[in-house]
């Protein structure tokens, strides 16, 4: 499967139009799934009224559906392979002040501590520390949001990004007990059309069943 953890656009849904053909070509055996990021809500645009803002968000959802993607808005799906199953959970953005927390994990998957292997799509990695590791047994969480602030320095095992001033978990794989978080640095840019060291990233993750 292919998953996308939000921020498909920066300000308005119209930004997606030139890329519809390319993104529609993404296919996977178990489907393409997405969630909304903070930029997808239109919170950074001075809309004429609330209706205009909501209409733009609706347009984004329609376009993603036309591309063959399934957006998970505080909901979940089960994926099967033989006798194995995985619960894929998608929540809306876990906002930081002054923006609201649209995400509702308990609504997306009420039985958060059952035995099913669970993958969570949550745009903001702060969500992992604030709710996921303390109140659930979700095995793997996938996030984005930080972009490593588009600046990363690395020398051997040492690395630095200004993103770590705000986000303790800003890039790569993290573990707490038996729970894992992967933060992808993304492929685009926000406001500044540049990346220094923080090269565009597409992550490939292989899950193996251990009997």
Language model features with spans:
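Soluble catalytic domains of enzymes that build or remodel membrane lipids, polysaccharides, and related
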Residues: 1-211
